Amino acid sequence: MSVLIVGMSHRSAPVSLLERLSMDDSVRGETTQALLGRASLSEALIVSTCNRLEVYTVTSSFHTGVNDVVEVLHEASGVDIETLRGYLYVRYADAAAEHMLVVTSGLDSMVLGEQQIIGQVRTAYQAANEYGSVGPALHSLTQTALHTGKRVHSETAIDDAGASMVSFAVDRALVQMGLDSEAEAPLSGKTALVLGAGAMSSLAATHLGRAGISNLIMANRTLERAERLAEHSLEAGVPAEVVEYDQRASAYNRVDLVVSATGADDFTVKPEDIPEGASLMLVDLSMPRDIDDACADLPGVDLVNIERLHKASREGGSGMAPSEEEALAIVREELDSFTSEQRIRDIVPAVSALRRQAASVGSDELDRLRQRAPGISEVEWGEVEKTVRRVVDKLLHEPTVRVKELAARSGSISYDSALQELFGLESLASTAAPATTSVNASELPDAGIVAFVNAPSATQTRE
């Protein structure tokens, strides 16, 4: 049984496709249960964010597992399998572990070092726990990934590269407004309308406040949540008020920016709602989109959304920063420790089976000896039993210690399989994952099932 990841991110797919695969809590729960309904899959965890959709699962068969995950994604999203094949990537065994550590550390994010992904992975883990879909493998891997992410952010200066996609979006908006994002209070004298009251909206309000915004207007479907967000802004020293969600358009003629992060089923900002001649900077932080792209066609209206942020991120790519090198060193260290522990755990069943077989052989020989030498006294027989068992234990001690040490090292040898072959042990249900870190599409039953997109790893530089 090995961990398998089938996913899609801003590095492998267009935003329009990521939107179609985006999952709310309800869809994620249904999809998780559908995954567990497949015979090849025994655990499941889904990470769904603005920039990625990744299915983490444990499978008994690589080929069948990949096919099952792709079919479930097709059923959940309505995206045809041929389209999915062109954009999905696959990570397996040690490569899957490395990928999760890199992702959770913010090293595969659109904004290098962003911290939101740690919370998103934690939320995905908690949800999977509630669904009952997390077992020993995903529990161990996720906890290691979260620990690694914390180390990366506390032991390096990676946070300086960019706190979140929200800060990136606000900075891009400032640039497009002709303002200096490095200035002390570039938004001084400006007013912003924030739609939504969740984590993204709260972060947006915080960043707008740090940029010196003079006034904030909050609107949310649940009025009380908008009022709480306004109270927090007031406590931070930023004047804030609340408008009814249905009356949000009435505020357009008195604001300079509109930031939307609601995840609504319909557009929150439409061209027909914007007053003629209005000068507006629109920032869309939702997936699927909150703001109709057609708004950007209006005179005086500009738009920043996730798709445009992706483009800006790709165009602004640069070499690896020292903090990123330090972060990757931590990932390598934690990955080595995790995979070593996993290989040791994988070999324990084979070692136990070997000891049971040796004990059984010893017992059989003692029984035969007892029948051939019935005159041995109980005291003498007790010494014979102790001696035979002591010899068996001593003979097995060094090999079992050594095989655990060897298993802890990375390599292509499966030591539990070697023990089974050498000593004729019965095939065990728990087998070690291969140390392979890459897979070719040609190895799959249908060579076109997935496009293997190389995400950054602990041994590669970032795109």
Swiss-Prot record:
InterPro entries (alphabetical): 4pyrrol_synth_GluRdtase, 4pyrrol_synth_GluRdtase_dimer, 4pyrrol_synth_GluRdtase_N, GluRdtase_CS, GluRdtase_dimer_dom_sf, GluRdtase_N_sf, NAD(P)-bd_dom_sf, Shikm_DH/Glu-tRNA_Rdtase
Keyword Cytoplasm carried by entry: no
MF (Gene Ontology): glutamyl-tRNA reductase activity; NADP binding
Site annotation Important for activity: residues: 99
EC assignment: 1.2.1.70
Active-site residues, as the UniProt record annotates them: 50 (nucleophile)
HAMAP family according to UniProt: Glu_tRNA_reductase
Free-text comment about domains: Possesses an unusual extended V-shaped dimeric structure with each monomer consisting of three distinct domains arranged along a curved 'spinal' alpha-helix. The N-terminal catalytic domain specifically recognizes the glutamate moiety of the substrate. The second domain is the NADPH-binding domain, and the third C-terminal domain is responsible for dimerization.
Protein name: Glutamyl-tRNA reductase
Protein encoded by which gene: hemA
